[in-house]
Amino acid sequence: MSVKAFDLVPAVEREQVMGEKVRINIECIECCGQHLYLGTNDCFIHHFLLEEHTTAKGKLAFNAQKLLHKYLGLKKPVVELKAASALERLIVLCDSAITVVDMVTLEPVPTGGAKLKGVTAFCINENPVTGDAFCVEMAVVLARRRAVQICTVHEDRVQMLKEVTTPEQPCALSLDGYNICLALSTQYMILNYSTGASQDLFPYDCEERKPIVKRIGREEFLLAAPGGLGMFANAEGISQRAPVSWSENVIAAAVCFPYVVALDEGFVTVHSMLDQQLKQTLSFRDGQLLQDFEGKVVVASSKAVYMLVPLPLERQIQDLLASHRVEEALTLTEAAQRNIPKEKYQILHRRILQQAGFIQFGQLQFLEAKEHFRKGQLDVRELISLYPLLLPASSSFTRCHPPLHEFADLNHLTQGDQEKVQRFKRFLISYLHEVRSSDIANGFHEDVDTALLKLYAETSHESLLDLLASENACLLADSAPWLEKHHKYYALGLLYHYNGQDAAALQMWVKIVNGDLQDSTRPDLFEYVVDFLSFCSNLDLVWRHADWALQKDQKIGVQIFTKRPTSEERRGQLNADDVITYLQKHSQALLLYLEHLVLEKKLQKEKYHTHLAVLYAEKVLGLISRPSTSEEQLSAARQKLQRLLKESNLYRVQLLLGKIQDSELLLLERATLHGKLEEHDKALHVLVHQLKDSSAAEEYCSWASASQDSSYRQNLFHQLLSVYLDPDVPGGAQTVAAVDLLNRHAEVFDAVRVLKLLPEDWSLPLLRPFLCGAMRATVHARCTSQVALGLARAQNLQLLHDRLKYRGGPVLVSEKKGCQLCHNTFSEPDCACLPGGTPVHINCVAKKALDLPHENAHHSNHT
């Protein structure tokens, strides 16, 4: 696609070159700064001074002042001109010979050394390798020789350094460092004249079409290839850029980055080196020459000279953006980096990215737009401002000037298409959600969060609650009316809470729960309000709303008090006694709160335990008196009472006994209370003779002795056995229950005591399990004690051994030392030691040990 990259501006008019001579043609051109040199076919060199100026319309124009012209006296065309500005010399190719003239006077300069004649072409090394600032490196092609000569031009001489042979006669060449790019008769090649390495490129017929060899950068060349292609090649012979497709009849080419300019018989064409596309075509008749000089592009016909003035890259980029050619604009922007100072480029690049983002935004290409906004570090308020009423009224934002886009607002952009409106809103939601936690939003979090809240509210987005429940910068003055407008009352309560207005938040939520306001956002809002109050540090608010919550649902409402954290500051704590007093009119809530204090928080206060036990007892008695009570209800209530009576030791037992004394259904509870008073005989009497539940009696014994020693447990079971065997109670002794008790718990009883209690008429088989168990327990106890005694003796012996070991020193035994018992010497190292460390024979000690009982008996007979 086309873009205007250059303006064609006249530089030297026809009359300034030709004068009155009709047959004068321009053969070559050279430009050095403001100085322009022309070589003509009549062997003249013309020297012009080009001065730039800007017209009234802002266009660039040139004034050409002719300073001098010089006739070389050879009557041959001047074929080539090259300036050596450091030497103030002009190298001239005329009549197959190279001469050097002064750049100012155009007078020939004597050159000692090599005489360069028979030259068909030459080029200057723009990447010299000699390191001498006061000489120019040059490559020369000689007629009818398959060679290239490397020379240096000094102020007063021309010196040949090296001659490099080539496979064929060179037609054209270009030089960069040690690398010579050559157009031979049938092909292009690259030759390193330092190493001798060469690389064939591709075939080309020089007789059919004029070759083009153009250095375009460090170790890179542009070549005219068959098929109307401009090929790029580096020093290794590799093309790192795609070729450009130009005319078959191109006669010259130049490079003005990022463009390749080509000249044919009727046109100047401009291709991009970045995407190889044709960007501009300029009509130019009788074109003869095209050269680039230090960023300038000069094109000449046979009679006049023109300048191709590149338009500023920024203007080219803006033209591309105006045509919505985003990728081309971005590519050109990145290519411009090499020609623009770093800071200026960064500013330009960011702006172009932002503009590109808005173009793609308008085309609904949201992924690309988002990426360009991110890379361009867009002030997100530029985007928000397109959406009516999203920016807070207090925002000081004004749009960038010049503007980054052509849109007035979202309505202008969508033209009333509601589907597009929703797509644009979804994009902004996504984008704001990403940037609000990044550096992009620094400095204007209020604008971002407020806009995001408004979008969430009007689209009923699920993230509205997440935004308000987390850290945010939403402005209350702007956000509250918006939430109310869109009936987001629960969210409005969250906003009030975040801004420290808990009273307003609770008022809003209570209205929703009561049905005064319609908002189905949170079906469990009542539970949420209760939970909120349980964490609220403002006790005035807690007490103000507690009665409302308890009237709604006591079971849930009491959680205001039961879920309240204990780690809060003291000002946020509630006194338990005050809560109990407050809950007197809410019986279910009071019971739940006392359960919380006693069973969950494990508070060890008698009044709480007693109060809870009394409430449990009253509830059970109430259920008993109610005919409609189900068995499950009564059983559950009794289990709670029984559990508390057994596990707690803090309640007032006598008070509870008085409460349940008259109930014939609460015998198990009465027995438990007697047990708490250590009245085990009464408890067992109730269980055995009134409740008639032997299993309950045995469980009672196990429960009552659980934290006691074995003797206490044994006495309690003996007491139960005595109750079973008591013949004076109605019904007489309970033989079966007694036998079952003995057989099941044989290990608990003292068998001797039991046998004394049992009637003599009981048969032995009846008590066999008990007696076997008792015998087994006795034998086990005896064996266990013997094992323990043996272990103790072994341990004692080991300790004595260790003691002797650590107290005694080494025992010396030798053939000269005798045994203290038999007085014979030792013949081997084995020995025993008497107390004191005296060594003796082992057999002597054994014999002494056998004699000791006899001696002891003898002594005892005489005492």
From Swiss-Prot:
InterPro entries noted in UniProt: Clathrin_H-chain/VPS_repeat, CNH_dom, Vam6/VPS39/TRAP1, VPS39/TGF_beta_rcpt-assoc_1, VPS39/TGFA1_Znf
Keywords: Cytoplasm, Endosome
Cellular localisation: Cytoplasm; Early endosome
Pfam families listed in its UniProt record: CNH, Vps39_1, zf-Vps39_C
Chain ranges of the CNH domain: 23-297
CHCR repeats: 564-729
GO cellular component, one term: membrane
A GO biological process held by the record: intracellular protein transport
Quaternary context: Component of the putative class C core vacuole/endosome tethering (CORVET) complex.
Family of this protein: Belongs to the TRAP1 family.
Role summary: Plays a role in the TGF-beta signaling pathway. Plays a role in vesicle-mediated protein trafficking of the endocytic membrane transport pathway. Believed to act as a component of the putative CORVET endosomal tethering complexes which is proposed to be involved in the Rab5-to-Rab7 endosome conversion probably implicating MON1A/B, and via binding SNAREs and SNARE complexes to mediate tethering and docking events during SNARE-mediated membrane fusion. The CORVET complex is proposed to function as a Rab5 effector to mediate early endosome fusion probably in specific endosome subpopulations.
Protein name: Transforming growth factor-beta receptor-associated protein 1 homolog
Organism: Danio rerio
Lineage of origin: Eukaryota, Metazoa, Chordata, Craniata, Vertebrata
Gene from which this protein is expressed: tgfbrap1
